[in-house]
Amino acid sequence: MSKITINQLHMALCEANSIMLTVHIRPDGDAIGSMVAFYEALVGQGKTVYMVVDDVVPEKYTFLRYTDHIHDVAYFETNPVDIDMLMVLDASTYERIGKVGALWSAPIFNIDHHISNTEFADHLYLKPDFAATGEIVTDLCRKWNWPITESMGTALYMAIATDCGFFKFSNTTANTLEMAAKCVAAGARPNVISETIEAVSASRLELIKQVMQTIEFYKNDTIATIELNREAMTILGDDTDGFVDIIRNVDTVDVAILLKAEADNRTRVSLRSKGIDVNAVASHFGGGGHIRAAGCTINLPLQEAKQALIEVI
């Protein structure tokens, strides 16, 4: 593995003719927004570009241009293509890209912002001080004088905004706001993006009401937990955004924990914090992320996983 500079990244992209873009499994707004924007940018530079995700693109992100160009692994297994570069966006570990890595032997490049990055790629461009990979892509386009179209601006604004809580989280910096402003200048409409992403159906609201009943507090109300059981996960799938923020906003709470029952003996966890390093907590269980936002999977039933987390915190 070698960490590369912005100039080395630019040179590698200039030399590549055929590029495959991918992101992590269970893709979020930053992953999808960054990928489709980078896709459009690279096509604009005359490159042959493909997109693959070893998962389903969440419905709420399909309003973005070029999401219909994203294929699953099975598509490329039956329609193989030759590539010069596998570009991994917003993924901090090799395991997070699923089966994608096994399909090609091309050099792996990684553009990421997670402090927990395992440096799995052949070439890594890491910016842990950036709030989102979308912020990195916007910054690259600016520094390389690549035009940001309206559709790119929309995708990149969504990428940035969703990874910093629409600019409410502590990872929001002056540069974050500057890059978001460039997206708006390109034609992104923050109100439309926010309304599209945050729209709530009546059925989801009914489920939220039920989930609220699972909220519990620990350690003098400084830790709060909220739970999604197997039934709720069947209904929601990976669309669990927002649940952890319900408890994060409680004034006494420093650590908010969302526990999602994936199986009888497997619990997926999302951690948010106002002060404690939750990346360290997640790393204890084999996960990672950021200082104030991280995640992990614990091979225990939900209630046991909850107790294990509270003991570590």
Regions found by a protein language model. Name each.
Residues 37-39, 103-106, 126-127, 178:
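Glycine-rich, phosphate-binding/catalytic loops in enzymes
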Residues 111-179:
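Short alpha-helices
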Residues 29-35, 94-97:
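Short glycine/serine/threonine-rich phosphate/pyrophosphate-binding segments
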Residues 25, 29-31, 91, 113-114, ...:
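Generic detector of well-ordered alpha-helical packing
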Residues 2-25, 33-62, 77-84, 162-284, ...:
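Hydrophobic helix-and-loop "lid/oligomerization" segment in the mid-to-C-terminal part
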